[in-house]
Amino acid sequence: MRSFASDNNSGVHPLVMEALNRANIDHSLGYGDDKWTEEAVAKIKETFTPNCVPLFVFNGTGSNVVALQLMTRPYHSIFCAETAHIYVDECGSPVKMTGCQIRPIATPDGKLTPELMQPYLHGFGDQHHSQPRALYISQCTELGTIYTPEELKRLTDFAHLNGMYVHMDGARIANAYAALNLSLKELTVDCGVDILSFGGTKNGLMMGECVIVFNKDLQSEARFIRKQSAQLASKMRYLSCQFTAYLTGDLWLKNASHANAMAAKLRAELEKLPEVTFTQKAESNQLFLILPRPVIDRMLESYFFYFWNEEKDEIRLVTSFDTTEEDVDEFIGLLKR
């Protein structure tokens, strides 16, 4: 069943599947001591910086937990937007695994600013308070919005000035860079991000993420934290080989650009309908809008999508690398009936 529910619902890109098949031909050493992982590590270092440490993990929550453990101790606090994945959608895993307090901050568009963070930065050195240590941001945000390089640099400078590390959740990072027409390095390393969760599952991979540690002070313990967090794959090559395919020939960019283009087409058609009200600026492959409840109920009979705020009749529509123009046309056609 085709849907606009999530980019997690899409399949695996054929080139990624070919890479998996090639990795499956013969036996290989486990736990990353294989040529496939060696190639993927080299590709990631070529893309970002030779000085990074890439760690392949199973999923997004795992990557976030590994990254945040590297940055914190249990008496620290982690700052994030109130819509952040680590606060809303990870079943308390970051709290359990780090022991840290999470401080959610209200934001109208999913993006944080120094001004929004400033009122929460207190208690430094006070033994009665959790000590601020990590800033978690998403690129794209959970509301589909995108940080510009200027916004990111201002935010990371502010965090570092206050003794905090910056972790970027890049589950949909490709969609952000496709929208801004910038390289992956320009919006991570060059903006002062300390650790990146580099995602691909939502953009054509079968599974897996990569924790990329840029900050040298956080690199030495990374392998041990990954193992302790149950994120070390014995058959590592099936995770790593996907990233080589993903970063070859700009497949990541082509997939994300197509998803963004399909979202733009869907948005353009929806804007023609008087009953549609958008609640967020449409910048990537996620659309947030309000429809009359009877219309939503009727559409759900044929298409699956998620409510974002059921009380307000707000829904989320997500396109992916394999969304077609026919998918968009059929959805709009049904909506107009």
Which positions does each model-derived feature cover?
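Active-site phosphate-binding strand-loop segment of PLP-dependent enzymes
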Residues: 4, 112-170
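PLP-dependent aminotransferase-like
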Residues: 72-131
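Active-site C-terminal subdomain of aminotransferase-like
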Residues: 109, 132, 136, 146, ...
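Conserved C-terminal alpha-helix-loop-beta "cap" of PLP-dependent enzymes
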Residues: 74, 264-336
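Conserved N-terminal alpha-helix of the aminotransferase class I/II PLP-enzyme fold
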Residues: 13-60, 83, 87, 93
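Hydrophobic beta-strand scaffold residues
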Residues: 101-102, 166-168, 278, 305-307
